[in-house]
From Swiss-Prot:
Keyword Metal-binding recorded: yes
Recorded metabolic or biological pathway in which this protein acts: Purine metabolism; IMP biosynthesis via de novo pathway; 5-amino-1-(5-phospho-D-ribosyl)imidazole from N(2)-formyl-N(1)-(5-phospho-D-ribosyl)glycinamide: step 1/2
Residues holding Mg(2+) 2: D121, D274
Quaternary data: Monomer. Part of the FGAM synthase complex composed of 1 PurL, 1 PurQ and 2 PurS subunits.
Species, as recorded: Listeria innocua serovar 6a (strain ATCC BAA-680 / CLIP 11262)
Residues the record lists as binding ATP: Y56, K95, D501, G538
Protein name in UniProt: Phosphoribosylformylglycinamidine synthase subunit PurL
Cellular component annotations (GO), alphabetically ordered: cytoplasm
Molecular functions per Gene Ontology: ATP binding; magnesium ion binding; phosphoribosylformylglycinamidine synthase activity
Predominant subcellular localization, coarse grouping: cytoplasm
Binding site for Mg(2+) 1: E97, N539
Record field: catalytic activity: N(2)-formyl-N(1)-(5-phospho-beta-D-ribosyl)glycinamide + L-glutamine + ATP + H2O = 2-formamido-N(1)-(5-O-phospho-beta-D-ribosyl)acetamidine + L-glutamate + ADP + phosphate + H(+)
Task of the protein: Part of the phosphoribosylformylglycinamidine synthase complex involved in the purines biosynthetic pathway. Catalyzes the ATP-dependent conversion of formylglycinamide ribonucleotide (FGAR) and glutamine to yield formylglycinamidine ribonucleotide (FGAM) and glutamate. The FGAM synthase complex is composed of three subunits. PurQ produces an ammonia molecule by converting glutamine to glutamate. PurL transfers the ammonia molecule to FGAR to form FGAM in an ATP-dependent manner.
Length: 739
C-alpha cells in the first residue's frame, strides 16, 4: 500500500497540525526542538503527547497547589496510581479516572473501557484490585436520551466490573440539567499491595528489551486523548472511532499474569505501565523519560489485528487491555513462558537506548526520531488568564433563599423522590458488589468497606462532590467535597488517609472557567491540609462543554480510610428501638445550592453553605474516637436534603421509627448546613458519649422507636410521617423515572 500521509511541507502550509490539535505556536516550538519540520508521524506524536489529557498543560500550575506528602504516603502523583501505608507492610493503591467524552458518544463501551483503564492503572503498580467505585453525573431523567445514557453507562460499568470479578462497592450519582449533553463518568479503583512489590513505570538499563503484552492493536481510539481535550459539538457524536472497545476476560488474564510477574519475577522486571490515553506512544515515552533513557521501537513487531496499519496508527491507537514491560536482558523467554500460560502473547518490540531519543522504525526505515523528554516532559505549560465570573458577586450579594414550607411532610416526600437523593438500589443492584467475598459494608451506607484478608483491618472508601456548591462558590465547594468524603469515612469507622481527585471542568480557555479550576483547587488544598488527606493521584478532564454550555465545576473526591479494627465498622441505619439519637453540629438556615432550592425555584443561586474546617476536623475526630471506643450504634453524615433526609434514611433499613425534638425550626429540617452528623447510641453508652462530647454543639434529640413512625417536634409544632410511606417513595423514584 502506498503511503498517503501528507508531506512535511503540506503539514506546514495546509496547517494540518491544527486538525491534530497543535496550535501555531506549538508547531513552531516542535520545529525549533527538532531543528526541522516534523513529518506526519512525529506531528501526531507531539499532538497527542502535548494534549491536555496527556500533558496537563493547562492544569499543571493549578495541580502544583495540592499537598501531596504525608507520613502515610508511599507513592504520590506521577505513577499509575497513588499508594498509602496501612501498616503491616501493606499499602492501598487507588486512583480515579474519567471517561466522560467517550461515554456520551458510546455510553456502554465508554463506561466499560473507563473501568478497564483504571483497573490497569492500579495493577500496573503491583496492587491487586479489590474494589471499584464510580461517580456519575447525568441530566434530568425527563427525556428518552437521558434514560438511555443512564441505563447504558450503568450496564457498561456492570458488564466490565462483574466480568473481571472486581466488586463495585460504592459511588454517587447526581442529576442536573448542565450534564444533559456532558455526562460525567468517573471510575475509581482501589487495590491492595505489599509495600515491597511497588512497581515503577520506567524503562532503564541500556539494551534491556521492551515487551508488549496483551491484546492486539487495532484502529480503535486513535486520538482519544485529543478528542478528550476539545469541546463537544453535535458533530462530536460522529467520532465513534475515537471510542475504544473493551474485553474484560482478556483483562482478567492480563491482570493475573502481570501480578504473577511482579510477585515471582520481580528480579527481572525493570518497569511496567498500562497503555492508556495515547496508547503506545504515551506509555513508552513516559517510561523512558522517567528513567532518563531513550527507546528504539520496531513497529513491524507490534501485534496488529488490522491490515496495513501505519506507525502513526499503531502508536496512537487506544486499543484496550495492553501493557508495556521493560525486562532485564536475557530473560525474555522466561516472561514469554509465563504469559503463554495465560494464553497471552508477550512480544519484544524494542529496546532501551542511552541517547534519550525516541526512535521509531518501520519496514527498516526511521519514521520518527525525536527527543523523548520533548514528548513526555517538555509540553508547553500555559498560565491561562483567570477572571471571576459575574455570577459570583451576584450570588454573594443576593438575599438568601428562604423556603416556604406549608406542608412539611409533603416537602419531605418530594425531596425523597428527587433522583439525586432517592435510593440508588436500582442502579447498584446491577453491580456484583459481593464478588471476592470481602465486602463488609455494601452500597447504600455512607462509605463502602472492604476487609483486608489475614488482618483485623478494613478499608473504607467513598466518592463525593456536590457540584452545586462549587457553582455558587468553587473554593468553599471544593473544601466541602473533601470534608464530606472524610465525613463519610469517619461515619463508617475509618480514619481518612488520602484522596484522589477527578477534576471535571468546562473549557479552560474561558477565563471564568479557569478561575473555577483555580478556586476549587484552593478549597480542596485547604481541606486536605486541615484533614491530613494528601492528594496522591488524580485525573483532569477539561472541555466538558457542548455547544458552548459547560458543566458545573465537578472535582470528584475519591477518598480512602483505614478501619483499624473490624469491630469499628459502623453504618448509617438505626439498630434498635430505645437507642438515643444525637445530632452533632449546628443547623442554620442554609438553603443556597440545596436540593430544596432546586425543587422550589428550579435553579440554584446565593452563597454556598459555610464550612469551618477547624470545627469539621474537631467533630470528625470526636466522632471517630467515640466509634473506636464502642459508644456508637449508627452514624450518618448530613448531606443533600439535610436533617430530614438523613433521619428518614436512618430508619429505612430496619423499619424503625424515631421520636425527636429538634433545636431548630421545622423548615430548617432540609437546610444543608455543613459539619453535621446524626448518631445513635445505646442507652448504656449515653453517659460516656455525652461526656466525650460535653463541650461541643451536640444535641440529644430523642430515641429510636419500634413503630414505623417518625415524629419531629420543635416547641409546639409536631410533624408525623410514616417510615414505610417515606421509604416506598425513596425506593420507587428512580425505577419509576427510568421507565
Amino acid at each position: 500500500m502506498p503511503n498517503m500521509e501528507p508531506t512535511t511541507k503540506e503539514i506546514k502550509e495546509q496547517k494540518i497540525y491544527q486538525e491534530m490539535g497543535l496550535t501555531d505556536s506549538e508547531y513552531e516550538l516542535v520545529c525549533s526542538i527538532l531543528g526541522r519540520e516534523p513529518n506526519y508521524t512525529e506531528t501526531g506524536l507531539f499532538s497527542v503527547m502535548w494534549s491536555e489529557h496527556c500533558s496537563y498543560k493547562n492544569s499543571k500550575p493549578v495541580l502544583r497547589k495540592f499537598p501531596t506528602e504525608g507520613k502515610q504516603v508511599l507513592q504520590g502523583p506521577g505513577e499509575g496510581a497513588g499508594i498509602v501505608d496501612i501498616g503491616d507492610g501493606l499499602g492501598v493503591a487507588f486512583k480515579v479516572e474519567s471517561h466522560n467524552h467517550p461515554s456520551y458518544v458510546e455510553p456502554y463501551q465508554g463506561a466499560a473501557t473507563g473501568v478497564g483503564g483504571i483497573i490497569r492503572d492500579v495493577f500496573s503498580m503491583g496492587a491487586r484490585p479489590i474494589a471499584m467505585l464510580n461517580s456519575l453525573r447525568f441530566g434530568e431523567l425527563d427525556t428518552p436520551h437521558a434514560k438511555y445514557l443512564v441505563s447504558e453507562v450503568v450496564a457498561g460499568i456492570a458488564g466490565y466490573g462483574n466480568s473481571i470479578g472486581i466488586p463495585t462497592v460504592g459511588g454517587e450519582i447526581q442529576f442536573d440539567p448542565c450534564y444533559t449533553k456532558n455526562p460525567l463518568v468517573n471510575a475509581m479503583c482501589v487495590g491492595l499491595i505489599e509495600a515491597k512489590d511497588i512497581q515503577k513505570g520506567q524503562a532503564k538499563g541500556i539494551g534491556n528489551p521492551v515487551m508488549y503484552v496483551g491484546a492486539k492493536t487495532g484502529r480503535d481510539g486513535i486520538h482519544g486523548a485529543t478528542f478528550a481535550s476539545v469541546e463537544f459539538s453535535e458533530e462530536g457524536e460522529q467520532q465513534r472511532s475515537a471510542v475504544q472497545v473493551g474485553d474484560p476476560f482478556m483483562e482478567k488474564l492480563l491482570l493475573e499474569a502481570c501480578l504473577d510477574v511482579i510477585r515471582d519475577h520481580s528480579d527481572i522486571l525493570v518497569g511496567i505501565q498500562d497503555m492508556g490515553a495515547a496508547g503506545l506512544v504515551s506509555s513508552s515515552s513516559e517510561m523512558a523519560s522517567k528513567a532518563g533513557a531513550g527507546l528504539e521501537l520496531i513497529m513491524d513487531d507490534v501485534p496488529q489485528r488490522e491490515l496495513h496499519m501505519t506507525p502513526y496508527e499503531m502508536l496512537l491507537s487506544e486499543s484496550q487491555e495492553r501493557m508495556l514491560l521493560c525486562v532485564k536482558k536475557g530473560h525474555v523467554e522466561e516472561i514469554q513462558a509465563l504469559f503463554e500460560r495465560y494464553g497471552l502473547e508477550a512480544v519484544v518490540i524494542g529496546k532501551v537506548t542511552d541517547d534519550k531519543m525516541y526512535k521509531i522504525i518501520h519496514h527498516g526505515e526511521v519514521v520518527a526520531n525525536v527527543p523523548v523528554d520533548a514528548l513526555a516532559e517538555d509540553a508547553p505549560v500555559y498560565h491561562k488568564p483567570s477572571k471571576e465570573p459575574a455570577r459570583y458577586q451576584a450570588f454573594q450579594e443576593e438575599d438568601a433563599f428562604v423556603p416556604v414550607i406549608d406542608d412539611v411532610v409533603g416537602v419531605w416526600k418530594e425531596l425523597l423522590a428527587q433522583p439525586t437523593i432517592a435510593s440508588k438500589r436500582h442502579i447498584y443492584e446491577q453491580y456484583d458488589y459481593q464478588v471476592r467475598t470481602d465486602t463488609a459494608v455494601v452500597p447504600g451506607s455512607d462509605a463502602a468497606i472492604v476487609r483486608v484478608r489475614g488482618t483485623e483491618k478494613a478499608i473504607a472508601m467513598t466518592t463525593d462532590c456536590n457540584s452545586r456548591y462549587l457553582y455558587l462558590d468553587p473554593e468553599v465547594g471544593g473544601a466541602i467535597a473533601v470534608a464530606e468524603a472524610a465525613r463519610n469515612i469517619v461515619c463508617s469507622g475509618g480514619k481518612p488517609l488520602a484522596i484522589t481527585d477527578g477534576l471535571n471542568f468546562g473549557n479552560p480557555e474561558k477565563p471564568e472557567i479557569f478561575w473555577e479550576i483555580e478556586k476549587a483547587a484552593d478549597g480542596i488544598s485547604a481541606a486536605c491540609l486541615e484533614l491530613d488527606t494528601p492528594v496522591i493521584s488524580g485525573n483532569v478532564s477539561l472541555y466538558n462543554e457542548t455547544d458552548g454550555t459547560g458543566i458545573y465545576p465537578t472535582p470528584v473526591i475519591g477518598m480512602v480510610g483505614l478501619v483499624e479494627d473490624l469491630a469499628h465498622i459502623t453504618t448509617q441505619d438505626f439498630k434498635n428501638s430505645g437507642d438515643v439519637i444525637f445530632l452533632i453540629g449546628e443547623t442554620k438556615a442554609e438553603y443556597s445550592g440545596s436540593e430544596l432550592q432546586k425543587l422550589q425555584q428550579g435553579k440554584i443561586s446565593g452563597r454556598a453553605p459555610e464550612l469551618d474546617l477547624a470545627t469539621e476536623k474537631k467533630y470528625q475526630q470526636l466522632l471517630l474516637t467515640a466509634i473506636q471506643e464502642g459508644l456508637v450504634a449508627s452514624s450518618h453524615d448530613l448531606a443533600e436534603g439535610g436533617f430530614g433526609v438523613a433521619l428518614a434514611e436512618a430508619t429505612f433499613k430496619a423499619g424503625l421509627g424515631a421520636d425527636v425534638e429538634v433545636p431548630f425550626e421545622l423548615n430548617q429540617l432540609f437546610s444543608e448546613s455543613q459539619s453535621r452528623f446524626l448518631v445513635s447510641v445505646k442507652p448504656e453508652n449515653e453517659a460516656a458519649f455525652a461526656k466525650l462530647m460535653e463541650l461541643e454543639k451536640v444535641y440529644r434529640l430523642g430515641v429510636v422507636t419500634a413503630d414505623e413512625t417518625i415524629r419531629v417536634k420543635h416547641k409546639e409544632e409536631l410533624v408525623t410521617a410514616s417510615t414505610s410511606d417515606l421509604r416506598s417513595i425513596w425506593e420507587g423514584a428512580i425505577p419509576c423515572l427510568l421507565k
